[in-house]
């Protein structure tokens, strides 16, 4: 090939479907011109081949992603509890006792320091509360990350693990705009509400965490769904909240209480009546709160309730 032809071949880009990788030489070659596009390329893929998803999973030697809700983030190994060998055969009693001893030592090795023990207990508590509240994994991961930062800052020292975990969950819910009240979270832990609230304020201050202002509308869908209300009733409740915002009635008010009152009004107007007690229990507020917000909204927005 002449020099002019060579320069012309180099100037013309090789079509993507004509580029092949020579594994032996580590080169990307254009089959159309024979030009070496890249040499000494590193193959980032595995050295093994698999033809089914099962084979791929079996031959892979890497673990899953880091898990914030496990005290060691899931990077340590765990001895299986199935009491079976590599061939799937059940272990004999003598071997089973030996493996049991290995397990005990392996657990002790995983949880050696006081911080490890603290995190192990805290992550179990976090998982328990998260499951009871039906929180998504993203919120639990955020709560675990907040708790780990609190441990690093020494905020847990002198405080109960339960109260700091509950406060971390509440902070995560606020950050992720997940409609959960402090009372709702506190009822699933041994710590009292006042202690959880104190830890929550401490976490925000010391970790410099910014949380958005709670919007009453975020609570409407969840409360309405648990009450079995129709979409039109929930939409009406959101409209009532919007009008209340425009009139300046939401400032300084508990968002859950406002949402509960708006739902109560919308349910009455749409003939899907629910009692104040029923709505208050679902919303995690008192009947008095629902009653007071109801009076404010109906009077200030001039809402006429039939048969009232």
Swiss-Prot record:
UniProt keywords (A-Z) are: Repeat, Transcription, Transcription regulation
Q: Where are the transmembrane segments?
A: none
Recorded hits in Pfam families, A to Z, give:
TFIIB, Zn_Ribbon_TF
Per the record, the coiled-coil ranges are none
What GO annotations for molecular function exist for this entry?
DNA-binding transcription factor activity; TBP-class protein binding
* BP GO annotations: transcription preinitiation complex assembly
- Signal peptide span per the entry? none
Q: Please name the Gene3D superfamilies in this protein's record.
A: 1.10.472.170, Cyclin-like
Q: Which domain of life is it from?
A: Archaea
Which residue intervals correspond to the sequence repeats? 124-207, 218-299
Q: Which SMART domains would you find in this protein's record?
A: CYCLIN
**What does this gene product do?**
Stabilizes TBP binding to an archaeal box-A promoter. Also responsible for recruiting RNA polymerase II to the pre-initiation complex (DNA-TBP-TFIIB).
Give the family per the record: Belongs to the TFIIB family.
Q: Provide the protein name.
A: Transcription initiation factor IIB
Q: Which organism is it from?
A: Sulfurisphaera tokodaii (strain DSM 16993 / JCM 10545 / NBRC 100140 / 7) (Sulfolobus tokodaii)
Q: Which gene encodes it?
A: tfb
